[in-house]
Regions:
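Short, isolated positions in well-ordered beta-strands
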Residues: 49, 72-73, 113
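Short, ordered loop/turn segments at secondary-structure junctions
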Residues: 70, 78-80, 120, 137
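A common structural junction motif
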Residues: 70, 103, 129-133
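Intrinsically disordered, low-complexity, positively charged segments
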Residues: 2-58
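Short, charged beta-turn/beta-strand-edge "cap" motif at the junction between a beta-strand
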Residues: 55-57, 66, 70-74
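Helix-rich terminal scaffold detector
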Residues: 1-22, 116, 120-158
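Mid-chain, well-packed structural core segment of small domains
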Residues: 76-114
Length: 158
């Protein structure tokens, strides 16, 4: 029989969150993990944290999970493999159009776009005469036009 450690038994279970606030520990999550309403990860103190949240919400950098015991755990956006393309004006708008047309999550900055690395998408961006660079960076894409909790998918007007 092997000894069971405290960290293997104790898990913080979080059913609530708030937008900001002080926290005693943090958990670093990539965009995919922050997009899940349920999940589990190791916090900065090496103990597990599990979250069970309302569907349809992406956790943002700096938000705070609240455990059943009242402990507060800050969400940190983890660096991940992203592509970034720099352009101005209509060239940037054209790249944004093509990325959006493929329903990709896109982060928008001042004269740049960032998306999760994908060689096929990088080739498409190259075909527009632009040159994506590869980075390891936190990814904070825009929420979609239909992402509010009251919409479960696309809403079409008659």
């Amino acid at each position: 029989l092997s000894a069971i450690t405290y960290s293997e038994v104790f898990m913080r279970e979080c059913f609530n969150k708030q937008n900001t606030g002080e926290a005693t520990v943090s958990v670093s999550l990539n965009f995919q993990a922050r997009s899940k309403s349920r999940g589990k990860a190791k916090a900065s103190d090496d103990l597990d944290v599990a979250w069970f949240l309302e569907r349809g919400h992406v956790m943002s950098d700096g938000e705070v999970l609240i455990s059943e015991q009242g402990e507060r755990i800050r969400i940190d956006a983890a660096p991940e493999a992203v592509s970034e393309v720099h352009a101005e004006g209509s060239r940037l708008a054209e790249a944004a159009y093509h990325l959006g047309n493929r329903h990709l999550a896109v982060e928008v900055g001042e004269n740049w776009l960032r998306y999760q690395q994908d060689h096929v998408i990088d080739e498409m961006i190259h075909s527009l005469g632009l040159h994506p660079i590869h980075l390891d960076a936190p990814f904070h894409p825009l929420s979609g036009a239909y992402s509010s909790s009251s919409h479960r998918g696309h809403h079409h007007h008659d």
